[in-house]
Design a protein with these regions (language model features):
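N-terminal beta-strand-loop-alpha-helix module at the start
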Residues: 1-62
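N-terminal glycine-rich phosphate/adenylate-binding segment common to multiple enzyme folds
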Residues: 94-103
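Glycine/charged-rich beta-loop-alpha catalytic/anionic-binding loops adjacent to active sites
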Residues: 63-72, 96
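Alpha-helix C-cap/termination motif
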Residues: 40, 65, 90-91
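Structured beta->alpha junctions
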Residues: 13, 51, 73-76, 102
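Short phosphate-binding loop-to-helix
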Residues: 69-91
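Short Gly/Thr/Asp-enriched flexible loops that form oxyanion-binding sites at enzyme active sites
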Residues: 106-111
């Protein structure tokens, strides 16, 4: 079955409430966005990034939950968010919701 929509949960500040979100075919957590996802009672399908800002306890929980983890080198040309967005776009998903990363500066999302 082709996936129609995705949620990308970025790390950083997040003012989103669970009841503001719908149902998603794919939930992608970006590095420390995994912690945000779990706080919203969401189980990610995929964690993506260099995992430099996610604690070991959260990684162990994700492994127990059998979440797929795509770990990248810290020294890379793309941000973790860019890698997550590319992954979702490669799945040909057009309906994408992005939460988190509310630092106030959009340039923090892209390198």
């Amino acid at each position: 079955m082709k996936m129609k929509n995705a949620l990308i949960v970025n790390g950083g500040l997040n003012s989103t409430k669970r009841d503001q979100l719908g149902n998603y075919d794919l939930i992608v957590a970006v590095d420390s966005g995994t912690e945000q996802a779990y706080k919203l009672f969401l189980k990610p399908d995929l964690i993506i990034g260099d995992l430099d800002s996610i604690d070991e306890k959260t990684i162990k929980r994700a492994e127990k939950d059998e979440v797929q983890i795509l770990k990248y080198e810290t020294n890379k040309n793309e941000t973790d968010f860019e890698l997550a967005l590319k992954h979702v776009l490669d799945e040909e998903i057009k309906d994408i919701t992005i939460i988190g990363g509310e630092y106030g500066e959009i340039d923090h999302l892209f390198s």
